[in-house]
Amino acid sequence: FLLFLVPGLLLSPDSWAQDAQKGARPGKVTVSGRWVVRADFFGTPIQLSMELKQEGDKLTGEFSGDKLEGTLTGNSIHFAAKDEQNGTEECDATVKDDTISGTVVFANADDPEPPSTHKFTATLVPERRPGPPRRHEFTPTTFYRQFSAANKPVLTVSPGDTIHTSTVDAGGKDEKGISRVLGGNPETGPFYVETAAPGDTLAVHLTRLRLNRDWAGSDDYMVGRALDSDLAVKMKDVGKSIRWHLDTEHGVATPEKPAEHLTRYTVPLRPMLGCVAVASNLAQAAPGTGDSGRYGGNMDFNEVVEGATVYLPVSVPGALLYVGDGHAAQGDGELNGNALETSMDVEFTVDVIPGKRIMGPRVASATHIMAVGLEGSLDDAFRAATANMAQWLTDEYKLTPSEVAQVLGTSAEYKVSEAADRNAGIVLKINTERLHPIAPPAK
């Protein structure tokens, strides 16, 4: 099972309970729906997901992703759930005013530690807001440097809504070159997405990424992962700042003060976001905005461009979406430790895929699906990307392990997306034309 810690100020239990109570049910108790469970683990509040399906007095569904079976007798609930590692959860609770409260016992047959019992309450995830999608114009005044659930949301939006905003560059400078915040990939957000709950997937459709100034900062440094001993010696004197001119009329970037052999060197502009993230699971300390992981973060993947969709696993209510670290262009791996760092004009549309559990970040373009692996070494990132894509093919295309192996063995394209940061990044791409003959069933 997965544990999700969320500070009290962001649990929004009152607002969720009020939304649920608007549809309060007279007469017989019914509990079908998606619930957010708030449990106390030895003094630490944690967050879990629960989905209940009721047929008469019989209950089925999932508790933090584990299949459950149980009963509803009057207003009393009892169910048991089990995971694939012999972990079990047994729940006894009471329903009152659209709130479920009780205890859950966690145990594992293979663990010598005795079972632990924890009190919890659960509230219904509200339904989507009625009416057409909205468009939001948001001008940021505060920028955060952690992908934290403790940061106050700057704006509340609904699935289907579009947000138009801007980002500062990695050093904290805005479109006028004015320092607005300490550097280190300061982020715009977080945006609270209504109905997003632990166990869901947030889809971020990047509808517009445009440069809003004519220069970018970078350097001539080379990251250690890219250097053998001989090249490291040759590169011992590099590390100077390099400023680039961004010519949006011709769509190219050039060094403002080019070295002798780079006087005619140009790079095509391809605006991208180095950071797209949801708030991390705060069972551990919130990661800084230079880090990456299951929550996305500083992925520095150069195909997170206009027209792409980024998928991220939700760990906290509202997802708490962050965007930032705009790049005018970047080669694979971000080998300089920086790309062409610049501020950005950004527009995106958000959506929520309820109950869709993915193991890590994913990206989709008009031509490819792309699974991201982010780990401490390139080898481990390679494995993580492969596992992420295997899950995608299994869940969406219903492929068997043998079929997954055949597809990957004939169609996998791997890219080194990130070599500069604590976590390395590998992306496994598959051209969707290869998958058309085995397209998933229509939903």
At which residue positions do the language-model features occur?
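Bacterial N-terminal signal peptides
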Residues: F1-S12
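Central antiparallel beta-sheet cores of small beta-barrel/beta-sandwich binding domains
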Residues: Q18-S116
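N-terminal, Lys/Arg-enriched amphipathic/low-complexity engagement segments
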Residues: P130-S179
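Short, structured beta-strand/loop micro-motifs enriched in basic residues and often containing a Trp
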Residues: T139-S148, R180-E187, P287-Y295
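Short, Lys/Arg- and Gly-enriched loop/turn segments at beta-strand edges
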Residues: A170-V181, L209-D220, G318-A328, S417-A420
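Intrinsically disordered, low-complexity linker/loop segments enriched in Gly/Pro
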Residues: R208-V304
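Conserved mixed alpha/beta catalytic, RNA-binding, or beta-rich assembly cores of soluble enzyme
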Residues: L269-N298, N302-D379
